[in-house]
Curated annotation (Swiss-Prot):
Self-association state and partner proteins as the record states: Homodimer.
Function text: The branched-chain alpha-keto dehydrogenase complex catalyzes the overall conversion of alpha-keto acids to acyl-CoA and CO(2). It contains multiple copies of 3 enzymatic components: branched-chain alpha-keto acid decarboxylase (E1), lipoamide acyltransferase (E2) and lipoamide dehydrogenase (E3).
Active site: 438
Cystine residue pairs: 44-49
Catalytic reactions on record: N(6)-[(R)-dihydrolipoyl]-L-lysyl-[protein] + NAD(+) = N(6)-[(R)-lipoyl]-L-lysyl-[protein] + NADH + H(+)
Keywords assigned by UniProt, alphabetized: Cytoplasm, Disulfide bond, FAD, Flavoprotein, NAD, Oxidoreductase, Redox-active center
Species this chain originates from: Pseudomonas putida
Lineage top rank: taxon: Bacteria
Localisation: Cytoplasm
Gene: lpdV
Entry keyword annotation includes tRNA processing: no
Protein name: Dihydrolipoyl dehydrogenase
Length: 459
C-alpha cells in the first residue's frame, strides 16, 4: 500500500478551470495536488477551443487562396492551391503540444504536484488514483463536460463527434452536421472552406437558436453564399446505408447521402466515472449546484466550470478557479461578474455580452437600443467584410450600458472591451467620449454609443 499523499487542496480535472486554480493556489503558497486522467488543458486545449480555432484558420487561409484562382478586385491571381490536410492537422497538433507543455511547466514552477490517472472520490476529504490515496482539506471538482450523444446516431465509423472532426485523416465528400449551434456551424463552415460539401440539420426553425434573429441573419446569409445547405425544423431518425435520415415533423422524410456525420448537439456536465455519487451533492439538473463562492452543498467541496453548469465557457471556468484558490487562501471573494462574453467563431463571428434587447424588455427595463453597421466602417471595408453591426443596450434614464452584441469580421476581439465597459459600470457617454483609433473595427463601438445618444457621426 502506497503512503497517503497529504495536501491542502486537491483538484480533479486539469482543464482551464482546474489548472488555473492550481496555478493560483501555488502562487498563494497552498499545497496543491492536481489529478488529470488525460492531457493537461482539458477539452479546451486539446479537443476544443484551441484546435478548433486552428482548423478554422487553416480553412480560412485555404478559402482565401482559392478565391484568387478567379479574377479578383484586389488584383491578386494565383494557381489552384492544394491542401495537405495531414500537414494542417500536424500544425494544429503542434500548437496544442506547445500550450499543454506550457501548462505543465507553469504547474511545476508554482509547486503543484500533478498526478496522472483517473480519480475515484472516497469521501469529501479522500480520493484514490490507481491505488494511490490522496487526503485533502479542500476538494475542487473541475471535471468538465462531454459531448451529448444521440441514441439514434451512436458514435463510430462515419458518425463522429467534434473530437474526430478536429483531426481528420482525409476530408469527406459530404459532411452532414447534426446541430445548428455554435460548435456545428464553426466546424461545418471550416469543412466547407476546406472543400467538402456540407449540410446542416437542425431540429429548431433557425440556426444559433440561443442568439436573436437579427444577429444570426448575417451568418445565415454567409452560409448560403458558401453553399452550405440548411435543413431546419428536421429531427434526425438515424443513419443507414450511407444516408442520414430525418423528418420534418409534417410527415416528410429527408435522406442525405453522407460519408461523414458530425453530431454536435451540445455538451453535458461530466459527473459520471468519479464516484461523485458518494458525496450526495445537491444538483442543479445535470450539473453540480454551487453558490456564489463556487461551494457545493458539502463543506470545503467546490465545483467550477462546465461540471457546475451553464454557461459552459473556458473563461468562466478560469475566473472561478482563480477565485476559489483565493477563497481557500483566506481572501473574501464572490463570483459576481457583470457579464461573461459568449463568442461564436462562425463567419461572420458573433459576440453577446450582457443583456440583449429582448432580455432587457422581459425584465421591464426601459432601454435605448442602437446599432452601427460595419458597412459604414472604413476598416471593415478594407477587410472586404461589410456585413454585420455593433449593437448597444443602455438604460434610458441614466445611460448605464447593460449589454453589447456584435456580428461581423473579427468581432471576437471586441468582446474584451464590451465586458470591461459593463464591469466598470460605463455609461454611453464614457464610450462615446473615448477617442477610438482610426481606422479600426472598434470605431463601430464608439459610433453605436454615439448613435444611442442621438448623434452618430458616420451614418
Amino acid at each position: 500500500m502506497q503512503q497517503t499523499i497529504q495536501t491542502t487542496l486537491l483538484i480533479i480535472g486539469g482543464g482551464p478551470g482546474g489548472y488555473v486554480a492550481a496555478i493560483r493556489a501555488g502562487q498563494l503558497g497552498i499545497p496543491t495536488v492536481l489529478v488529470e486522467g488525460q492531457a493537461l488543458g482539458g477539452t479546451c486545449l486539446n479537443i476544443g477551443c484551441i484546435p478548433s480555432k486552428a482548423l478554422i484558420h487553416v480553412a480560412e487561409q485555404f478559402h482565401q487562396a482559392s478565391r484568387f484562382t478567379e479574377p479578383s478586385p484586389l488584383g491578386i491571381s494565383v494557381a489552384s492551391p492544394r491542401l495537405d490536410i495531414g500537414q494542417s492537422v500536424a500544425w494544429k497538433d503542434g500548437i496544442v503540444d506547445r500550450l499543454t507543455t506550457g501548462v505543465a511547466a507553469l504547474l511545476k514552477k508554482h509547486g503543484v504536484k500533478v498526478v496522472h490517472g483517473w480519480a475515484k472520490v472516497l469521501d469529501g476529504k479522500q480520493v484514490e488514483v490507481d491505488g494511490q490515496r490522496i487526503q485533502c482539506e479542500h476538494l475542487l471538482l473541475a471535471t468538465g463536460s462531454s459531448s451529448v450523444e444521440l441514441p439514434m446516431l451512436p458514435l463510430g465509423g462515419p458518425v463522429i463527434s467534434s473530437t474526430e472532426a478536429l483531426a481528420p485523416k482525409a476530408l469527406p465528400q459530404h459532411l452532414v452536421v447534426v446541430g445548428g449551434g455554435y460548435i456545428g456551424l464553426e466546424l461545418g463552415i471550416a469543412y466547407r472552406k476546406l472543400g467538402a460539401q456540407v449540410s446542416v440539420v437542425e431540429a429548431r426553425e433557425r440556426i444559433l437558436p440561443t442568439y436573436d434573429s437579427e444577429l444570426t441573419a448575417p451568418v445565415a446569409e454567409s452560409l448560403k453564399k458558401l453553399g452550405i445547405a440548411l435543413h431546419l425544423g428536421h429531427s434526425v431518425e438515424g443513419y443507414e446505408n450511407g444516408c442520414l435520415l430525418a423528418n420534418d415533423g409534417k410527415g416528410g422524410q429527408l435522406r442525405l447521402e453522407a460519408d461523414r456525420v458530425l453530431v454536435a448537439v451540445g455538451r453535458r456536465p461530466r459527473t459520471k466515472g468519479f464516484n461523485l455519487e458518494c458525496l450526495d451533492l445537491k444538483m442543479n439538473g445535470a450539473a453540480i449546484a454551487i453558490d456564489e463562492r463556487c461551494q457545493t452543498s458539502m463543506h470545503n467541496v467546490w465545483a467550477i466550470g462546465d461540471v457546475a453548469g451553464e454557461p459552459m465557457l473556458a473563461h468562466r471556468a478560469m475566473a472561478q478557479g482563480e477565485m476559489v484558490a483565493e477563497i481557500i487562501a483566506g481572501k473574501a471573494r464572490r463570483f459576481e461578474p457583470a457579464a461573461i462574453a459568449a463568442v461564436c467563431f462562425t463567419d461572420p463571428e458573433v459576440v453577446v455580452v450582457g443583456k440583449t434587447p429582448e432580455q432587457a424588455s422581459q425584465q421591464g427595463l426601459d432601454c435605448i437600443v442602437a446599432q452601427f453597421p460595419f458597412a459604414a466602417n472604413g476598416r471593415a471595408m478594407s477587410l472586404e467584410s461589410k456585413s454585420g453591426f455593433v449593437r448597444v443596450v443602455a438604460r434610458r434614464d441614466n445611460h448605464l450600458i447593460l449589454g453589447w452584441q456584435a456580428v461581423g469580421v473579427a468581432v471576437s476581439e471586441l468582446s474584451t472591451a464590451f465586458a470591461q465597459s459593463l464591469e466598470m459600470g460605463a455609461c454611453l457617454e464614457d464610450v462615446a467620449g473615448t477617442i477610438h483609433a482610426h481606422p479600426t473595427l472598434g470605431e463601430a463601438v464608439q459610433e453605436a454609443a454615439l448613435r444611442a445618444l442621438g448623434h452618430a457621426l458616420h451614418i
